Regions:
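Topogenic membrane-insertion module of multi-pass membrane proteins
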Residues: 1-57, 61, 155
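Membrane-embedded alpha-helical segments that form the functional core of polytopic membrane enzymes
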Residues: 31, 44-75, 132-143, 190-214
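Acidic (Asp/Glu-rich) catalytic motifs at the cytosolic membrane interface
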Residues: 64-89, 210-232
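Multi-pass membrane catalytic core of lipid/isoprenoid biosynthesis enzymes
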Residues: 85-126, 228-263, 306-313
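Extended hydrophobic alpha-helices typical of membrane-associated regions
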Residues: 260-325
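Functional transmembrane core segments of multi-pass inner-membrane proteins
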Residues: 160-220, 238
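Intramembrane alpha-helical segments
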Residues: 93-182
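Small-residue-rich segments of transmembrane alpha-helices in multi-pass membrane proteins
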Residues: 27-33, 158-172, 234, 300-319
Length: 327
């Protein structure tokens, strides 16, 4: 079916609106947090004491919040006039194309926000009342990113925090809090977070930020005209390409913490990700300028965007396999 012939508010329209390719960025941090918790709990207590309930809830919460963020971005970019079809270089968007009506998108934003809250509420049982604060902050920043913060060049920092530190560390935290080992001393304090977990979360955030850098690199001329001062706009083209390359290198270098904690494969396997990352960087570097061919530029950049999403998934799988393979 031609995308221009999609029936409004149809199942296919909503599927496109969820932006399935972005979901790897939501899943990978949680999967890494789960793998870290499973590894530590198995070695300290035994695999039978790992609780899958909070793990599944964290994964569902991440998926719903990512879809919620995509809906919010779709709606507000349309409302602010930032999705002009003639200027747009990226994939087409639901509201702008009329695939989803504005009223339906508003309802979808409200519904996914409620679903995220419902999915997240049981985590209070495992992680305590502080999980309420975590959930509220996640929801608030979903709205603030599109409406304000992305225009201030804070997008990359938010990705590091909300696609790295928060999901990895919080997932690890709530799973470890769920351990009910029968012989624990009353004054026992579980490892709610370790340096391995924190550095792994930073590495994950850097990898996911590569996706945002490619997206903003593609759109930098339009963003500059719209007054959207992303980090790419501030750095310029050459330094942005250097930033993209550095994100992958630093993320893999941080993986030395896995080796130091007895998980050599979790350090070695991400080399596969790094090879793919460098290949994507070479494509960015060799792309024809936008001024020469708008169509060729858009095609190359969107291809790089798809590769960046794939690379995130490859990185996550390499780390997860590396953490679990020795158990």
């Amino acid at each position: 079916m031609n995308k221009n012939q999609i029936k409004q508010n149809s199942l296919k329209a909503w599927l496109l609106a969820t932006r399935p390719k972005t979901l790897s960025g939501a899943a990978v941090p949680v999967l890494i947090g789960i793998a870290l918790a499973y590894s530590d709990i198995s070695s300290e207590f035994g695999a039978e004491y790992f609780n899958w309930v909070p793990a599944v809830l964290c994964l569902l919460f991440a998926f719903v919040m990512q879809i919620n963020a995509n809906f919010i971005n779709d709606f507000f970019d349309y409302a602010n006039g930032n999705d002009d079809t003639e200027r747009r270089l990226g994939p087409l968007r639901a509201c702008t194309q009329g695939w989803v009506s504005v009223d339906a998108m508003k309802r979808a934003i409200a519904l996914t926000t409620v679903i995220a809250c419902v999915v997240g509420l049981p985590l209070i049982w495992f992680g305590g009342l502080e999980m309420i604060l975590v959930g509220v902050v996640c929801v608030v920043f979903c709205f603030l990113y599109t409406t304000h913060l992305s225009y201030m060049g804070l997008g990359d920092l938010l990705v590091l925090v909300f696609f790295g530190i928060v999901p990895v560390c919080i997932t690890y935290y709530v799973i470890y809090c769920s351990v009910r080992y029968p012989y624990l001393a009353e004054d026992y304090v579980p490892h709610y977070c370790t340096w391995q977990v924190f550095l792994a979360s930073v590495a994950c955030g850097l990898v996911v930020d590569g996706l945002l850098v490619v997206n903003n690199y593609r759109d930098r001329e339009n963003d500059r005209e719209d007054g959207k001062l992303t980090l790419v706009v501030r750095l310029g083209a050459r330094n942005s390409r250097r930033l993209f390359l550095a994100l992958g290198i630093v993320a893999c270098a941080l993986g030395v913490v896995f080796w130091m904690n007895g998980h050599l494969l979790a350090f070695v396997l991400p080399v596969l990700f790094l090879v793919l990352h460098v290949y994507t960087w070479l494509k960015l570097k060799g792309a024809r300028p936008l001024s020469e061919s708008r169509a060729a530029w858009a095609a190359t950049m969107n291809n790089c965007l798809g590769e960046a999403a794939r690379n995130i998934l490859v990185y996550g799988l390499c780390v997860v396999i590396g953490l679990l393979i020795l158990l």
